Amino acid sequence: MATLFIADLHLCVEEPAITAGFLRFLAGEARKADALYILGDLFEAWIGDDEPNPLHRQMAAAIKAVSDSGVPCYFIHGNRDFLLGKRFARESGMTLLPEEKVLELYGRRVLIMHGDTLCTDDAGYQAFRAKVHKPWLQMLFLALPLFVRKRIAARMRANSKEANSSKSLAIMDVNQNAVVSAMEKHQVQWLIHGHTHRPAVHELIANQQPAFRVVLGAWHTEGSMVKVTADDVELIHFPF
């Protein structure tokens, strides 16, 4: 058996091929797993569990079917869907996890996260992240009418796109010191995350031992998952 990890699908109505590919994944590979972990940015945007978006209901039902089949499903928030709440989690049968979680998998201690907190060189983003994760600000935003939330979210996405266009690729990648610090804090030799859209398996030293950082790819033109078994940790790409 295997435990599966995915991230950065950025589901939206404008990308039906990705949605169709994810539905096939849920109906196939996911049903064979010991567990499924979604490490953030499942959706391109999330302005509240109360948004009457048919895509959200469709995805909730599909994930719930996996959960009901006996495969536990877990979710860590990303930078796009950090407002996804308990209502959607309940509807989809997912368990919400903290932003950093250590798993014991087949004899390995594995740290999982979305990955945006590792990009500490991007001071502008980290300041923005700290602001929008304030509970009182989230409560205020979610209390606004839906049409107002949609306008604010659209403006924020436009501002983010403009800001990122002038940033170097290095700044938007993880900081190696932040990676080592996180792994040593949790005493792990394995880290799995998404966010950067730069799929790879990196070797490093943490806790004075060889360690590995596995980065999930985004679901742009193909699917991406990490498959952890008793024998191996594989980064796998597959067609929709």
From Swiss-Prot:
Keyword Lipid biosynthesis on entry: yes
NCBIfam families, A to Z: lipid_A_lpxH (TIGR01854), PRK05340.1 (NF003743)
Binding residues for Mn(2+) 2: D41, N79, H114, H195
GO annotations of cellular component type: cytoplasm; extrinsic component of plasma membrane
Residues annotated to bind substrate: N79, R80, D122, S160, N164, K167, H195
Any one GO BP annotation for this protein: lipid A biosynthetic process
Name of the protein described by the UniProt record: UDP-2,3-diacylglucosamine hydrolase
Membrane disposition: Peripheral membrane protein
Binding-site residues for Mn(2+) 1, renumbered to this chain: D8, H10, D41, H197
Alphabetical keyword list: Cell inner membrane, Cell membrane, Hydrolase, Lipid A biosynthesis, Lipid biosynthesis, Lipid metabolism, Manganese, Membrane, Metal-binding
InterPro entries (alphabetical): Calcineurin-like_PHP_ApaH, LpxH-like, Metallo-depent_PP-like, UDP-diacylglucosamine_Hdrlase
Function as written in the Swiss-Prot or TrEMBL entry: Hydrolyzes the pyrophosphate bond of UDP-2,3-diacylglucosamine to yield 2,3-diacylglucosamine 1-phosphate (lipid X) and UMP by catalyzing the attack of water at the alpha-P atom. Involved in the biosynthesis of lipid A, a phosphorylated glycolipid that anchors the lipopolysaccharide to the outer membrane of the cell.
Pathway where this protein functions: Glycolipid biosynthesis; lipid IV(A) biosynthesis; lipid IV(A) from (3R)-3-hydroxytetradecanoyl-[acyl-carrier-protein] and UDP-N-acetyl-alpha-D-glucosamine: step 4/6
A Pfam family recorded for this sequence: Metallophos
EC top class, as a word: hydrolase
Catalyzed reaction equations: UDP-2-N,3-O-bis[(3R)-3-hydroxytetradecanoyl]-alpha-D-glucosamine + H2O = 2-N,3-O-bis[(3R)-3-hydroxytetradecanoyl]-alpha-D-glucosaminyl 1-phosphate + UMP + 2 H(+)
Family under the similarity heading: Belongs to the LpxH family.
Highest taxon in the source lineage: Bacteria
One GO MF term attached to the UniProt entry: manganese ion binding
Main location group: membrane
Cofactor comment: Binds 2 Mn(2+) ions per subunit in a binuclear metal center.
Organism: Shigella sonnei (strain Ss046)
Coiled-coil intervals, chain numbering: none
Location within or outside the cell: Cell inner membrane
Cofactor list: Mn(2+)
E.C. number(s) listed in UniProt: 3.6.1.54
